[in-house]
From Swiss-Prot:
Plays a key role in chromosome recombination and chromosome structure development during meiosis. Required at early steps in meiotic recombination that leads to non-crossovers pathways. Also needed for efficient completion of homologous synapsis by influencing crossover distribution along the chromosomes affecting both crossovers and non-crossovers pathways. Disulfide bonds: none annotated. This is Pachytene checkpoint protein 2 homolog. Coiled coil: none annotated. One of its GO terms (cellular component) is nucleus. GO terms for molecular function: ATP binding; ATP hydrolysis activity. GO terms for biological process: double-strand break repair; meiotic recombination checkpoint signaling; oogenesis; reciprocal meiotic recombination; spermatogenesis; synaptonemal complex assembly. CDD domains: RecA-like_Pch2-like. The keyword Phosphoprotein does not apply. It comes from Gallus gallus. The keyword Membrane does not apply. SMART domains: AAA. The lineage of its organism: Eukaryota, Metazoa, Chordata, Craniata, Vertebrata. InterPro entries: AAA+_ATPase, ATPase_AAA_core, ATPase_AAA_CS, ClpA/B, P-loop_NTPase, Pch2-like.
Amino acid sequence: MDEAAGDLKQALPNTCDNVQIHVEVHQKSNSTAKKEDIRMSVLKLLNRHNIVFGDYKWTEFDDGFLNSNVQSVSIVDTELKLKERQPIDLSKSSLTIHIFHLNEEGPSIENLEEENEDIVAANHWVLPAAEFHGLWESLIYDTEVKSHLLDYVTTTLLFSDRNVDSNLISWNRVVLLHGPPGTGKTSLCKALAQKLTIRLSYRYRYGQLIEINSHSLFSKWFSESGKLVTKMFQKIQELIDDKDALVFVLIDEVESLTAARSAFKAGTEPSDAIRVVNAVLMQIDQIKRYPNVVILTTSNITEKIDMAFVDRADIKQYIGPPSAAAIFRIYLSCLEELMKCQIIYPRQHLLSLRELEMIGFVENNVSRLSLVLKEISRRSEGLSGRVLRKLPFLAHALYIQSPSVTMTAFLQALSLVVDKQFEERKKLADCV
């Protein structure tokens, strides 16, 4: 075992330096310490631990000031910039420290009054919100979706701040994520809003996330829907007017608001639907003039979205089912959580795919369980991210039912529940 571990250590690349590293500092809710004091203490911590392997989180400190005022210090998003898992020399890196409090109040509901009836039009969060803490890290994709979205919005806000003439260089601050259900599109929008609020805290004091309830904006009197859309955006305008706030407008299943004109021409959509489309497009055109707003939209049925809306989206990103490599990383994060909670016990070190590749996927005492997980991941292809994160729970509920279990036994249960998932899908398909 020692020999195998030594082979792995030898295969690891040299340290990586001269990279930008983001450090997120979660300040305790009851802390009133000055950010500059926290920043100086965090820098001292990083100076004492200046070599890290990828993302890393501290939750316990030998510094009394940090213990009293800080919940956690996290080195984040290293995988977005580094293609390989490399040791990072923090002393030779450019460190950007983001200090934030979490808002723990939860969402509020925005109502619109119509014909003496209150219509739930939207959910409203003040960011960064405790509800979304850790959501960004839980979302795993094959392509560079997360880094592209971060870079896009950062560039958008930079161009706005520098007063770039939008008549010469056009951008609309609209993102469209499309793909099959269960791939994490809505979660990614919420996580992106949270992440950007933290990253841009030097520029905006807080964030606002408004999730529009598309279906409720269609009143039972369809002709009123256009008016409801206008009323909703008037409320959003009030938030945008606060220049200290970064405002995100999330329209989930945007196809329900932007029914295609082609369907109207074919006679399958009522003329009132066009009024709704026009109302949405007009409101987007009005608020895009403001530098502190970003519109995030999702769709499960891309072909039903009005092309005039699609053209307004700067980024049209397909979010598909995860590959075997992404599934492996999803399972790895689930198993790590179960080991942390001692449901899987004793703790076992599982290798990443990169580490397996560096030892040529050779089976030994160090790699055996990781190779089993790799095979389970291969057999899980075709399942959505939403389903994959349910499988560890189902594995325990259906095949274990004990307070703690070994990693070997848990992987056997996970393998069985994957087979069961595909069997149930086949039965459902046969019934249709």
